[in-house]
Swiss-Prot record:
Major site of localization recorded for this protein: host cell
Name of the protein: Replication protein E1
One Gene Ontology term of the molecular function aspect: DNA helicase activity
Sites where the protein binds ATP: G467, P468, P469, N470, T471, G472, K473, S474
Known role: ATP-dependent DNA 3'-5' helicase required for initiation of viral DNA replication. It forms a complex with the viral E2 protein. The E1-E2 complex binds to the replication origin which contains binding sites for both proteins. During the initial step, a dimer of E1 interacts with a dimer of protein E2 leading to a complex that binds the viral origin of replication with high specificity. Then, a second dimer of E1 displaces the E2 dimer in an ATP-dependent manner to form the E1 tetramer.
Catalytic reaction equation(s): Couples ATP hydrolysis with the unwinding of duplex DNA by translocating in the 3'-5' direction; ATP + H2O = ADP + phosphate + H(+)
Disulfide-bond pairs as recorded: none
Post-translational modification remark: Phosphorylated.
Amino acid sequence: MDCEGTNEEGRGCTGWFSVEAIVEKHTGDTISDDETDNSSDTGSDLIGFIDDSSISDYAEQEVTQALFQAQQKQANTKAVRNLKRKLLGSQNSPLQDITNQHRQQSDSQQNTHQVNNSQAKRRAVDSVPDSGYGYTEVETLTPVQVDKQYEENGGLPSVCSQGGSNASVEDIDVDTHVNSVTQICELLKCSNVKAALLSKFKTVYGVSFAELVRVFKSDKTCCSDWVCAAFGVAGSVAESIKSLIQQYCLYYHIQCLTCNWGVIVLMLVRFTCAKNRTTIKNCLCMLLNVPETQLLIEPPKLRSTAVALYFYKTGLSNISETYGDTPEWIVRQTQLEHSFDDATFDLSKMVQWAFDHDITDDSEIAFKYAQLADIDSNAAAFLKSNCQAKYVKDCATMTRHYKRAQKRSMCMSQWLQYRCSKIEEGGSWKEIAKFLRFQHVNFIYFLQVLKQFLKGTPKHNCIVIYGPPNTGKSQFAMSFIKFMQGSVISYVNSNSHFWLQPLEDAKVAVLDDATYSCWLYIDKYLRNFLDGNPCCIDRKHRSLLQVTCPPLIITSNINPQEDNSLLYLHSRVTVIPFPNTFPFDSNGNPVYALTDVNWKSFFSTTWSRLDLEEDADKENGEPLPAFKCVPGENTRLL
């Protein structure tokens, strides 16, 4: 029933309304002084009395806004109702399966029913029964079918169900979003997630991820270059990763392609330092906001030309973003001038490198020379060869031959100069003099003994350092042998016929901690060794060799000159006693530093007193000409 005084402006509305007043005048009513009964009321005096222009505009705007809110609320309610009806009402809905898994996890019969439902979802589209709600076809449509219908309808999306009902535009948007979420849920439920990721990567990028990378089984293995693939990344995050990752790397190559899972990001990254897979996973999970199960991380194939060409060509296109300097392994395999540097392997260059760096061990040669492959073309050719073990063995053998011949060609003075040239400056000879004074050894007497010792004078070819334990005998002898690059023999191997074989190429040798049985062995078999005369030693798998015993230092807790049973050794050894315990400071460091730099300073200072020969060609350069086993090259232009 209408209210009196209204003009049906709209039921239930809160807008403005007009009211018409009815005034009746009866005869005999008193008229006020300011009113004239006879005057005609035209209303001209009330024009502009009330300004209702702004009020009417505001009223119209408020009515429009209220109507829009009501319509928007109605549309939202309808969309939510349709979504609930579609996802929760259909038996084929993936969310319905997830709900059943949580509700019926403990029931074995229901688990069997879930397996049947998961198998039913893999059937063909035409075998799916109609749910009766008009959304069956929408659930089974793939994104490709939706795109085709979008193009056929001229850009207006429409999907028809089997019952003939039309879905609204809002339903299509909701279904597309739910479809991508459903795909990720299906990925998480896969028995082999990595296989699903590899398949999707090859489908989207057209190249297998395994063709671009080499596999690291351990997550703790470090590498500076990594290939990373991230699945299901949000579009805004995929764009921001290009700026966020710059602080962690020196170079990156990023590609972003979209599929029904979201954005798949492919990255080739060179980090500022070597990192392992675990560290990179934590970093990318934070930057991309994706779980670890949606990441593939492996190092690239550095020696594959196809991989280098792939990243080089895609880097030139507009589908990728690059930052920093291109890695050298890509440049070397893609640019023409670098391809000319690839040469065949030359063993002489490898031998020259090992000789210059004084490396004679097989394993050390193989390891260190392989690390030069990025900067040395011959090392790169060595890695490409199938005969690396043979080359390493031949290189070590030839290097030892050259080193042995070089050492034999030097006298003691030349060898001391050569050893001093390999050691840096900055030592102090006073450290050695202070230690000898601490052990009550006359410094002048020690220089006289050392002079005859270095010359190999018969009967003065052996120095014995004896004293109580912990007096620094072995420290003093070993530091001297290290500087001279001498050899060490051990009495523990005396049962072998070859325990004296290290004396074959030694300039100086040491026998540490000789016991009483060792002295008896020396007195019985090695008297001529202590004399410094030529003798014969046995070598394994080789013929006997006649050599002159090098100067020998023996450390012992026994003084052979005080033992009458060793009478024949008294004239063959020079004894230097060390009676005092070796001192250390409060931090455990030795008070007297017996280092190579101090020994170099010692010999440089006492060179003339030791009566060592001066090299006549020393002013013109090195004491010996540089060894060169690589043929020279003519660099002159034609």
